[in-house]
């Protein structure tokens, strides 16, 4: 569980921003969203496979040489 301690005379908005930052670093929010609803094992495998294909395609696109513009 993520906790933060309030410092003396710290505004609530600043404490809330610190809390959000720690949640982001821990990766808690995406995990909660993923666990919100049950996902079939086949759907999970398909989603992960599609994400891997997309990552691979993106990596290949960044390695390709640009076309000559002349």
UniProtKB/Swiss-Prot annotation:
Provide the GO biological process annotations: translation
Keyword Ribosomal protein, does the record have it? Answer: yes
Origin organism of this chain? Cupriavidus metallidurans (strain ATCC 43123 / DSM 2839 / NBRC 102507 / CH34)
Q: List the disulfide bonds.
A: none
Under HAMAP family, the record lists: Ribosomal_bS21
**Highest taxon of source:** Bacteria
Please give the name of this protein: Small ribosomal subunit protein bS21B
* Keyword terms of this UniProt record: Ribonucleoprotein, Ribosomal protein
Q: Does the keyword Ribonucleoprotein apply?
A: yes
Q: Which family does it belong to?
A: Belongs to the bacterial ribosomal protein bS21 family.
GO cellular component term, pick one: ribonucleoprotein complex
Q: Name one GO molecular function term.
A: structural constituent of ribosome
